[in-house]
Amino acid sequence: MSEEKPLKVSYSKQFVRDLTDLAKRSPNVLIGSKYITAIHCLLNRLPLPENYQDHALVGEWKGYRDCHIQGDLVLIYQYVIQDEFDELKFSRLNIHSQTALK
C-alpha cells in the first residue's frame, strides 16, 4: 500500500482578502457547518457532498474547481499534484458575481 503524499496548503492574496471581507460582513458563514465541512473534505481529500455542486471550471479558470458554500457564495480551489507533495490552493471565496465566473 502506498503512503499518501503530504498536502501543502496555500492561499492566494485575493483569497485572504475575500476571507477577511467575509469575516467582517458575515462571520457566521465561516463558523457554519457548510464552510467547515467543505474545508474538512478538501484538506482530507474527501469528495464534497453533492449539495455543494462541486465542479471543474473552464476558460481562464481551467484546472480549478468551485463549490457552493451557501447560496451564491463560492469557494474556488485547485489541487496540484507534484512529485514530493500535493498542493491545495485556495484562490477565491466570494459571491459568484465577484469571482469573474460566468
From Swiss-Prot:
GO terms for biological process: mRNA catabolic process; translational termination. Signal peptide: none annotated. The keyword rRNA-binding does not apply. Toxic component of a type II toxin-antitoxin (TA) system. Its cognate antitoxin is RelB. The keyword Magnesium does not apply. Keywords: Toxin-antitoxin system. It comes from the Bacteria. PANTHER family: MRNA INTERFERASE TOXIN YAFQ (PTHR40588:SF1). Belongs to the RelE toxin family. YafQ subfamily. This is Putative toxin YafQ. Gene3D superfamilies: RelE-like. InterPro entries: RelE/ParE_toxin (IPR007712), RelE/ParE_toxin_dom_sf (IPR035093), Toxin_YafQ-like (IPR004386). It comes from Haemophilus influenzae (strain ATCC 51907 / DSM 11121 / KW20 / Rd). GO terms for molecular function: RNA endonuclease activity.
